[in-house]
Regions:
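Residues that define the transmembrane beta-barrel architecture of outer-membrane proteins
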Residues: 15-17, 54-58, 65, 96-102, ...
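Residues on the lipid-exposed face of transmembrane beta-strands in outer-membrane beta-barrel proteins
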Residues: 21, 60-66, 104-108, 118-120, ...
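Flexible, solvent-exposed loop segments that connect beta-strands
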Residues: 32-49, 81-97, 125-143, 210-220
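Predominantly the C-terminal beta-signal and adjacent terminal strand-loop region
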Residues: 34, 183-235
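Short glycine/proline- and aromatic-enriched beta-strand/turn motifs that initiate or cap beta-hairpins
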Residues: 10-81, 228, 234
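Repeated loop/turn-to-beta-strand initiation elements of outer-membrane beta-barrel proteins
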Residues: 68-71, 113-116, 161-165, 194-198
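Transmembrane beta-barrel strands of outer-membrane/channel proteins
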Residues: 21-27, 73-77, 118-122, 167-171, ...
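Transmembrane beta-strand segments that form the barrel wall of outer-membrane beta-barrel proteins
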Residues: 164-179
Length: 235
């Protein structure tokens, strides 16, 4: 949640640079479609089985900002999985995804509450697909990596007392890395002290990536989403 959490520093020089370190964890569900070669797995997580699909993700980030510019670097790790079978158990399918995302973001303040963002995001993905029909089982695995540019907006508004609400959205890909990537974060932050804050929020990362042909063909049209909580230290 790093790039979406500027602080108000009315008493400080507008040109003075401030630093923050963030750590947060999130539960993440996954849905969409994944295909490797001719093996395709549709992932559809309903409300009833959402928590069966939840696995763990974590992020660390560093942000430096003044009242005009901000620069953020963050690393996110996600381990996601899903599986389903027919009622009679004659067929089943599953998907496991291990993903590292490294994102660098530059921000320019447009108004006291609104920031324009430009990011470069590197995705490193390991996917494992399993399909079983009766006693015949097929499993395929592939690795993929790509870089996406993104543009976005970040809106931050105090909501009383020590609380702040934030909404950030980014869109990118544009056929450079993926066909389409989009990213959304919404958070509520409580500033306990001048140097310590904690967060509750919800995050979505989605991409449509396609590469290769024949047995080496890969297509991932996936959405990863879930609640998260984190802490931040300012200095």
């Amino acid at each position: 949640f790093a790039a979406c959490s500027p602080l108000a520093h009315a008493q400080q020089d507008p040109g003075e640079w401030r630093q923050r370190v963030f750590v947060y964890g999130m539960g993440a569900a996954i849905e969409g479609d994944a295909q490797i070669g001719n093996v395709k797995v549709p992932v559809d997580v309903s409300i009833s089985d959402l928590f069966d699909a939840l696995k763990f993700g974590a992020m660390a980030a560093y942000r430096v900002e003044n009242d005009v510019w901000s620069f953020t670097g963050d690393v996110t790790y996600m381990n996601l999985g899903w599986s389903a079978q027919t009622q009679q158990g004659r067929a089943s399918s599953g998907l496991d995804v291990e993903q590292i995302t490294v994102m660098g973001t530059a921000g320019r303040r447009l108004t006291p509450h609104l920031e324009a963002l430009f990011s470069l995001a590197y995705f490193d993905l390991s996917a494992d697909l399993q399909v079983r029909v009766l006693q015949q089982r097929t499993e395929v695995s592939r690795d993929a990596s790509w870089v996406d540019p993104l543009v976005g907006l970040n809106y931050v508004v105090p909501i009383g007392g020590k609380w702040t609400y934030t909404l950030r959205g980014d869109v990118g890909g544009f056929g450079i890395g993926s066909d389409l990537t989009w990213h959304m974060i919404t958070t509520f932050r409580r500033q306990n002290t001048q140097r310590f804050a904690w967060y509750l929020g919800y995050r979505v990362i989605a991409y449509d990536y396609e590469d290769g042909s024949g047995r080496n063909y890969q297509h991932y049209d996936l959405r990863q989403h879930g609640p998260g909580a984190g802490i931040a230290f300012s200095f």
